Amino acid sequence: MLHKVKANLYLYDVTSSYLEGANNELADYGYNRDKKKGKKQIVIGLLTNSEGMPVAVRVFKGNTSDSKTIPDQINLLRNDFLIKKVTLVGDRAMFPQAQKDDLAEQISYISAIGKRQIKTLLKNEQLQMSLFDEDLQEVEIDQVRYILRCNSHRTQELAGNRADKIKFISTKIEEKNTYLQEHPRSSTDVALKEVNAKLQKLKLDKFIDIEIDNRSIKYAINEESLKEESKLDGCYCLVTNLDQADADKATIHARYKDLSMVEHSFRTMKQSHLEIRPVFLRREDRTKAHVFVTMMACMIEKKLSEYWSNLEITVLEGLNALTTLINTTLSIGDSKLTKAVQANGLCKKLLGKLDINITKEVKSVSTF
């Protein structure tokens, strides 16, 4: 815990950090968010308040799933923060359906469901496609509230991406057909296998069918399958067990979008000058301490960013500017006279925003 917390709504997300060394007590293989195949990792759970300010961080073994980290956060909030009524905001990986049912008695949650679950609810006629609109809609099923919306901009973006992929695969098939015609001894089976692999990689195999016809690859778009695949483009569904009296649908939507602040903190930890990597440690307690210190630095950076927000300068640029402030020390015998250099220009503004004044007095320090 980094500071005293009085709120009852918290944002929570999980990330991983790969390790270059060996024999770390927490290292293990797991779902690697850094896309580093063959690397062991640690899993990090970050808890922030509703403004995105870090309040606690936990480190888990590298093979820990997102949902398995939730009980630890509940214990933290209940026992350390002494919060009786807890509302936790997390993505859909945090709260699988089975866990939502178990947690309903312990905490309130705001999360989301995937397209597979949405399709199931549509099939069971518990939801209707007409509810997915630019304006937020709400449905309550078995004391769980479902907040629905369709982002038209995202719908157009996905449709455009899919069209670009279809155009790309069409060009690749034409190139492959040209090669087959120019090389009579080349294998059509190999060519078909390569195109199939490309279709799967681009996730077009659900609605594009291919076959060999007279040493030429033919493809056809299954319009019905394409329509089904694109039906939920831009659509999403949030879920919560909060009462309407506690939060309306607009508030639920806004709080879920606030998760981006936690993601920003993770990027700051992993990709900026704070440098959580590389981890030159093996013991569990030291690894956790390393992540904790990095998280405290992230908290300080966030506060500095708030104080310096109207100076049109990044935190790193501000810190670099402050490194020019030095003390002048004059030694006379066994005595030392130290005078702080006065801040001017940008440094004066930076310190002023932090309500820090450098004394003009000359201090005498005697040494023995």
Language-model features, listed with the residues they occupy:
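Anion-binding and metal-coordination hotspots
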Residues: 1-368
